[in-house]
């Protein structure tokens, strides 16, 4: 009995020490967390679960009421081309070069320049705003947890203690708010595993084009429901792409392992050359490395509007404002249209585009001293409901507006996830553009229905095997 009492005292002392360590660690985390618990609670009241302002503007931006999370009855199976849930919607008005000044308050500098560059043909049909953004409940729950635990490294280049949701849904008032917003884009919800066959197209000045068709598989390790922060192994996603056409490029393949902490681990990339039948490391597939299929119109970190390490720019949060951005673009991505219907000289056919007024976060990046990149400045407009970069204005080394990118967003209601259905990269100086993610002429759209194959699938050996098929 006496010896038991001695053991109990030892145990009490042991657990007291352990509890003190745990509490001190929790306190340190809370002090350094993005927001307080009371601020995080706003995600359940005045803010949406992903951090947007829940209420409307009292005029033409409605309140968010849960988004679009149920497919129309006509949508029957995974991978099916999306049925437009709003076929009855018509443009409220159309912005053109002739009336641009009337609406300039709600346009980005890049959009204004597109009107000036193509005054006779570029237009923006403005539709009723529908806040269709939605995500699964478990993503909302993880976003709440991230709000009170996620941190950035002191230089902002690494994300810590986040998993399975937006890391910074409530931006703080520090100098890191801009890079927090950028990390929200980098890690935003895009599904867990997807398979896609799509075309990317470089469109010449005269409108001629030749599609490059690729088959892609992406596993977003950060969004594996069966994972924890400890299980991520510093991996944001795995990406495997195999070129199917044209014949001169067919069989070429790329594999990417994308890290979360890019300060400690650089992106790992491999390329398979079908002609040589060899897999090689591709150490430079980042920053402003040109993408071969884009004919010089897209660089590595242009993909997905922005990706990769943020370390070459100083980022600042400029403001939140209302902007006309591409949204709910079901018609543009419909399989009822051919690429010939869509691709025109200078820009995509505006007859099939849809723009709506949404609130966006404006984030500006200026090139740091003693580093190189073709863009001296980048201005991103992030949709507040999803953290997607919807428009990107990018400047050359002379400070001139050079390139304008737009993501034609829609909600994949079968999951749900709100993401781009097609990205367009405009070179204003060359008067050319490049598109990525076109599926109009493919048998299917993105298929989210299969379980993730796991990290053992995304290997150089698999890259070689897939390239040979």
List PLM regions with ranges.
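Bacterial N-terminal signal peptides that target proteins for export
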Residues: 3-19
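Bacterial N-terminal signal peptides
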Residues: 18-27
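Sec/Tat signal peptide C-region and signal peptidase I cleavage site
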Residues: 27-34
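Gly/Pro-enriched, hydrophobic low-complexity segments
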Residues: 34-35, 40-68, 95, 108, ...
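Solvent-exposed N-terminal domain segments of exported/luminal and surface proteins
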Residues: 37, 42-266, 273
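Extended beta-strand-rich segments in extracellular/periplasmic secretory proteins, especially
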Residues: 197-245, 303-380, 390
